[in-house]
Amino acid sequence: MRWRFSTLEIILLLLVVAGSGMAYAWVVYGGGGLIGATYALFMCMPILAFERHIIFRRLYRRIHGSPTPAFLLSSLAVYFIFVNVGYAAAGLLLHVAGVMRESRTDAMLPSLNVLVYALATSGPIIFVLRVRELLGRDVFLSLLTGRYRKPVQEERVFLFIDLAGSTSLAERFGDLRMQEYLGKLFAAMADPVLRYGGSIDDYVGDAAVITWPYDRAVADAACIRCVFDILEQIEADAHRWQKDYGEVPRLRAALHGGTIVAAEIGVDKHKITYFGDTVNTTARLEGLCRTLNRQVLISADLLRRLRPPVFVRAEDLGEHEVKGRGQKLAVLSLTAGSLSGDGATEPAGETVRSPAAEAFTSL
């Protein structure tokens, strides 16, 4: 699991934790800000790293898969251990460095007040991070700053990615097992989406809606790379899917971009939502995957504005009627480059010609 923060967010997090330690030292002891900051970082950062799946990932998954009472008790026990070990490590470091005048034992054993402080400091930070994770980074920051209090028109790219054969899987697995299956599938998408600067806007049944600002999506074909990274990750873990569920996910994906209107809606529950033909067209394009028997489709409008990765082949499928759209949509299929029959590699990043392919000669 990748570290899910930007460099600026990491710096701010460190400053908040260190600042709280300095404040505690000044209030309780009347000084020693550096010592307080050191203790705070050593005690709180392991807890935050654990909550962000950076350390002890298996233990984290096991705890979060437990019933609520066991989850609460186990979490508190882990936090208690982290605080004590962190305090002891900080105390030993400060004592060896000659900063602490107390005995080594006193420097390494936390008082009850210190334990309460550590949990009181970590708790609100963990709460904010969980809200951030629930909403997504971009949505969290947009809601926090009120960016979309008034409707804003902007250009975005959307990726609709859907699980093929979900109905038969649900009948075979049952509701609970199917939800677990979908949960792991969506979790597998998280890292590629973050890696390529996207954000998961919503989950609709067995489908995920992923979006980027237009410039970010077309830069180095990030939106296309994201799709194939997701597919590659599923394929790489095929043995695990087969072992755990007896079924490897088969996905369909559609990419399209254009002008939309973004707005913050709701009173008791707020949400940033996107309106416009672009969103509807992407959803219809994903439906064409089934009709055309293709795994990944992209609109010609979007493909014109980016350069596909060298490992991707684009096959022109012509123009197709899209429900709710007044004009036909030019569509292409994307596949990872493969070997032809004579062992030669297909021209990567090029469009396979068909009568309507001339529009893409500039790619």
Swiss-Prot record:
A Pfam family of this chain: Guanylate_cyc
Catalyses which reaction(s): ATP = 3',5'-cyclic AMP + diphosphate
Cofactor note text: Binds 1 Mg(2+) ion per subunit.
A biological-process GO annotation: cAMP biosynthetic process
GO molecular function: adenylate cyclase activity; ATP binding; metal ion binding
Region (Disordered) residue spans: 341-363
Residues engaged in binding Mg(2+): D162, D206
SUPFAM superfamilies: Nucleotide cyclase
Cofactor(s) needed for function: Mg(2+)
Enzyme Commission number(s): 4.6.1.1
Keyword set includes Phosphoprotein: no
Keywords: ATP-binding, cAMP biosynthesis, Lyase, Magnesium, Metal-binding, Nucleotide-binding
Gene3D superfamilies noted in UniProt: Nucleotide cyclase (3.30.70.1230)
Location of the Guanylate cyclase domain: 157-286
Entry function: Plays essential roles in regulation of cellular metabolism by catalyzing the synthesis of a second messenger, cAMP.
Annotated family: Belongs to the adenylyl cyclase class-3 family.
Protein name: Adenylate cyclase 2
Species annotation: Rhizobium meliloti (strain 1021) (Ensifer meliloti)
Encoding gene (name): cya2
